[in-house]
């Protein structure tokens, strides 16, 4: 793994940095407190071409033969330093919607759905989770019934969907044969505005307030056969392989959150004076900061390694699970310690470390809980 960033990777990193500093930082506190999903801001981000880093030029991207996964991961990490909600909005579009279409879609599907996602003219989402089917995807109740004309009729709902109600294109999973369990799940591509496809509850979340999360509702939604993604009954495999990539995006988000919290804690420790000297002059605080830095750097290596293995076309399932587990745990520990360094001020929404701590928690949950990452890693060891 080469630790030297290419010129292209540095360009994408700078794009994300400049956007974060100029566009996200000035308004993130207000948008977080008011729970504002800023569509104009997201549209501006998508127009920068960061979504294209992941894909080849053939589909509107910037890569020669499959794009550059690390460039995209660097951008997600950098954006998360400024606004974790915006970072996951990008990650869900690229990792969870565009990527499975690129990996499993037909050329016609790629032309119709992938290209606008890559070019940044449309936003994407991924609908797998249901009220009674979180980790256990085989327990989902959404049904896709095949009609005589070859179309499918979807009925059911999905919850906790990132970009729900904001996205233009959705990857949705439904049971086409309940008797087959996981082998009876099929993936479909749905478009916003399809008759019968509506939105339910908007989630009031602990963190990532600038990301929109909503319920998807399907009532007799007619889906053409050409919108089936992959083969019938292969949806579970598609979902799991998609989540592998999504975990690297979440790990990058967690890394960015942790870095922001550390930067805030370092700065505060230099300014806050107690007992006649800055907090950073107390060994207990300087050691705490050092430990936070060490954890972040260890997590960074795992995240970048997973991204590089995916880029190289090597098996990366376990690497993604490890990176996601470690980076999200580090984010939670680092943000908690940052709040501790701030003391009472850290518990106040007046300072950003409270937001960082709230944002960090979800990284231990979505794209598979951290307990699932242990199952994935342990299963690979014992196989």
From Swiss-Prot:
Signal sequence interval, chain numbering: none
Cofactor(s) needed by this chain: FAD
The protein, known as: Acyl-CoA dehydrogenase, short-chain specific
EC number: 1.3.8.1
Record organism: Megasphaera elsdenii
Family to which this protein belongs: Belongs to the acyl-CoA dehydrogenase family.
Database matches in InterPro entries: Acyl-CoA_DH_CS, Acyl-CoA_Oxase/DH_mid-dom, Acyl-CoA_Oxase/DH_mid-dom_sf, AcylCo_DH-like_C, AcylCo_DH/oxidase_C, AcylCoA_DH/ox_N, AcylCoA_DH/ox_N_sf, AcylCoA_DH/oxidase_NM_dom_sf
EC class of the enzyme, as a word: oxidoreductase
Catalytically driven reaction(s): butanoyl-CoA + oxidized [electron-transfer flavoprotein] + H(+) = (2E)-butenoyl-CoA + reduced [electron-transfer flavoprotein]; a short-chain 2,3-saturated fatty acyl-CoA + oxidized [electron-transfer flavoprotein] + H(+) = a short-chain (2E)-enoyl-CoA + reduced [electron-transfer flavoprotein]
Keywords noted in UniProt: FAD, Fatty acid metabolism, Flavoprotein, Lipid metabolism, Oxidoreductase
Domain of life of the organism encoding this protein: Bacteria
GO terms, biological process: fatty acid metabolic process
């Amino acid at each position: 793994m080469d630790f030297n960033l290419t010129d292209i990777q540095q360009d994408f990193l700078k794009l994300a940095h400049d956007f974060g500093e100029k566009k996200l930082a000035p308004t993130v506190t207000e948008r977080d407190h008011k729970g504002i999903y800023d569509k104009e801001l997201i549209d501006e981000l998508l127009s920068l071409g960061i979504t294209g880093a992941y894909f080849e030029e053939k589909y509107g991207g910037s890569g020669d033969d499959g794009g550059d996964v690390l460039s995209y991961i660097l951008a997600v990490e950098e954006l998360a330093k400024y606004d974790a909600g915006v970072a996951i909005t990008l990650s869900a579009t690229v990792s969870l919607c565009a990527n499975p279409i690129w990996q499993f879609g037909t050329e016609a599907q790629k032309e119709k759905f992938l290209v606008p996602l890559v070019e940044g003219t449309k936003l994407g989402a991924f609908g797998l989770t249901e009220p009674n089917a979180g980790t256990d995807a085989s327990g989902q109740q959404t049904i896709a019934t095949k009609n005589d004309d070859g179309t499918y009729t979807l009925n059911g709902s999905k919850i906790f969907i990132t970009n729900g109600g904001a996205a233009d294109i959705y990857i949705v999973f439904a049971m086409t044969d309940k008797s087959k369990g996981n082998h009876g799940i099929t993936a479909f591509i749905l478009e916003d505005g399809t008759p019968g496809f509506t939105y339910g509850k908007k989630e009031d979340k602990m963190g990532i307030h600038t990301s929109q999360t909503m319920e998807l509702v399907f009532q007799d939604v007619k889906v053409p056969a050409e919108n089936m993604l992959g083969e019938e009954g292969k949806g579970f495999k598609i979902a799991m392989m998609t989540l592998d990539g999504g975990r690297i995006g979440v790990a990058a988000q967690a890394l960015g959150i942790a870095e922001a919290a550390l930067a805030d804690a370092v700065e505060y420790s230099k300014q806050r004076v107690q007992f006649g000297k800055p907090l950073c002059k107390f060994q207990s605080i300087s050691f705490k900061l050092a430990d936070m830095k060490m954890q972040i750097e260890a997590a960074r290596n795992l995240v970048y390694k997973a991204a590089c293995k995916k880029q190289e076309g090597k098996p990366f399932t376990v690497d993604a699970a490890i990176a996601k587990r470690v980076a999200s745990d580090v984010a939670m520990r680092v943000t908690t310690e940052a709040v501790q360094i701030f003391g009472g001020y850290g518990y106040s929404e007046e300072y950003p470390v409270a937001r960082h701590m709230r944002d960090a928690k979800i990284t231990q949950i979505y794209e598979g809980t951290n307990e699932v990452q242990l199952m994935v890693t342990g299963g690979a060891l014992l196989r």
